[in-house]
Amino acid sequence: YRENIDYGSKSLTIIGENRETTIIDGNNSGRGAELAGQSILSTFTIQNGSGNNGGNAVHASGNAILDNLIITSNSNTLGNGSVMLEANTVLKNSLIVNNQDVGVVCNGADATISNVTIASNTGAGIELKSLGGSNSHPTLINSIVYGNQDNNNIQFSAPSGHSINISYSLIQGGQDSITTYTNDTLSWGTGNLDVDPLFADTANGDYRVNVLSPVINAGHPDSTDSDGTRADMGAYPYLKTYNGPVWFVDAVNGSNFGSSGSSVNAFAAITPAIKFASSGDSINVAAGTYVENLDFEGKNLKLVGADAATTIIDGDSSGTVIRM
């Protein structure tokens, strides 16, 4: 859909069929979408938005909700964000990547950002601004901010007085990478990580995560993914489709991308089998060399190799090989 969508003063809900295939293309002639009030925009890719104002892809204000979106390949020359959030907006379950600008600008916003991946943008991942005079006080939870080309994945802008609450999120560089100014407040909560999220293939735009990723089951313990397990961080949850009680690992024929651990869809490493298994389950490991350090996580598990001579767990001289 090559158009620029403006909700005007209406509170509307617009939902696409599939976020991968239902595309709003701004045709490099303005914002992809602008909405306010109680409006909802959900399940689209928004691309090729452009302009010098805030939110070249999406500008949301009021109590608007942005849900299940892919926002990519948008450009802005003033650093006012591919997405601009104002007032009490919500951004969730969305991927914001490969934009020629800051990923998300919070402008005088008490916004909530949850289960969002913000990566590979040319500016900061998130920037707090007060272009209209009001400071920003967003909450970031269950999200990933990683690999943005500006050194600041989260950035405070003058004048001071902004605040952000971050919990159960992966922030590249961690707390020490975020510079605050006088009267700014950084609330660094529980459960945050500073590690590689192990994206599948960013060169080809695949921001799903490897089953070895530390973001799996690392979201807030009271939040869940659609499979009923503890929430992951980011826009692409790993959804459990197999429940054992026998798990399968094969270094040669298995995979750590999209695998379930079943006999026909084995993992390539032992660690994810331990992660998803329940106490009392068994893990059958095919012949091969597995370079990993294993922790049974307090579970009662049965780990069985194909043969002692050909099934090898190699700790790579980096710590205890097996903790059980």
Where are these regions (language model features)?
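Residue-level detector of conserved, well-ordered beta-strand and adjacent loop positions
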Residues: 15, 25, 97, 105, ...
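Right-handed parallel beta-helix/beta-solenoid
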Residues: 196-205, 238-272, 276, 287-289, ...
